[in-house]
């Protein structure tokens, strides 16, 4: 078989001439510069040098509004349309006093804080709201009683958000991320697995299923559900697609079934989102990295993250392939 490789020099001395070359010789550069592509077969090789220019595909981003939380780090957020037709947002907190803040964001130029929920936790890392806009779930880490788990909140009226249940069975190691999909909460347990909790009666949550990799030293950071498929991000073990109700593999919330997976060398897989391209019929999962090459600064200065967005073609579930990646400026 042919063996393909490349080398290059970037236009900017501050950037490394990186890129990607596939087994069929398709090449894409991450930064502009001069690159040499080499194809080798046996004792012979051919090479071609080419100039790669930036596409300059840019768009200005305009700040419309700013909801200030000055005394604690904000962790995550979720925006939804309330049952009254107005737009709302809930934000979590990191390393604070276990607070979640609720906002009216109907006018993006004027974000209005409308309520606060405080729970026993140091960090409310993740916040999600059900599709019907009635139920919110927040995660807990660092609880004084070490039970952690999650908290279920009635947000039918976000101005009077009310806790209606807590759940910590099997989740005492801390819940870092959660997701709500069709009367079920998917909650990460201590970075090892996700438990699936039925909330058809949100006042009486009950566990109905779980999914955990059968791999040495496995861990998980996030899970996202769409069309009955759970997309989990598992650091070194990459992205896993699991049937939790879609039907393609016979999975249900109480009996999740793996569909496909893909891992990449860095092992930084932190989040994943599905995308179907209607024009081409291709199905992709965009996998995001989490990396802090200069360390994590939480006290006296900014933290500069790094890493890539990986575009993985899952059209052929048996042969997923990474087709491109984008380096996040850092």
What is the predicted role of each segment?
Residues 1-57:
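Extracytoplasmic soluble-region selector
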Residues 33-34, 47-330:
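Feature marking well-ordered beta-strand scaffolds used for ligand recognition
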């Amino acid at each position: 078989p042919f063996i393909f490789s490349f080398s290059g020099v970037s236009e900017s001395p501050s950037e490394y001439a990186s890129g990607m070359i596939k087994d069929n010789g398709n090449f894409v550069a991450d930064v502009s510069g001069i690159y040499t592509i080499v194809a080798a077969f046996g004792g012979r090789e051919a090479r071609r040098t080419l100039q790669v220019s930036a596409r300059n595909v840019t768009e200005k981003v305009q700040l419309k509004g700013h909801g200030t939380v000055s005394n604690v780090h904000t962790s995550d957020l979720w925006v939804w349309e309330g049952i009254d037709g107005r737009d709302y947002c809930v934000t979590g907190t990191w390393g604070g006093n276990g607070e979640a803040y609720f906002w009216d964001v109907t006018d993006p130029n004027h974000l209005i804080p409308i309520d606060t929920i405080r729970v026993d936790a140091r960090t409310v890392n993740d916040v999600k709201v059900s599709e019907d806009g009635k139920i919110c779930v927040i995660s807990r880490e660092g609880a004084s009683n070490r039970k952690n788990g999650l908290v279920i909140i009635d947000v039918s009226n976000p101005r009077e958000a009310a806790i209606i249940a807590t759940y910590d069975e099997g989740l005492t190691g801390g819940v870092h991320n959660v997701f709500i999909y069709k009367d079920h909460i998917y909650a990460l347990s201590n970075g090892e697995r996700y438990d699936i909790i039925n909330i058809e009666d949100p006042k009486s949550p009950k566990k109905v299923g779980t999914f955990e990799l059968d791999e040495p030293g496995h861990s998980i950071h996030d899970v996202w559900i769409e069309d009955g498929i759970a997309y989990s991000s598992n650091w070194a073990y990459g992205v896993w697609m699991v049937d939790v109700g879609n039907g393609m593999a016979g999975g249900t919330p109480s009996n999740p079934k793996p569909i496909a997976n893909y891992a990449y060398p860095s092992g930084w897989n932190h989040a994943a989102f599905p995308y179907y391209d209607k024009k081409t019929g291709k199905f992709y999962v965009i996998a995001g990295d989490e990396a802090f090459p200069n360390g994590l600064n939480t006290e006296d200065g900014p933290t500069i993250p790094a890493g890539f967005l990986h575009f993985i073609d899952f059209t052929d579930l048996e042969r997923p392939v990474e087709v491109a990646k984008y380096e996040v400026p850092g």
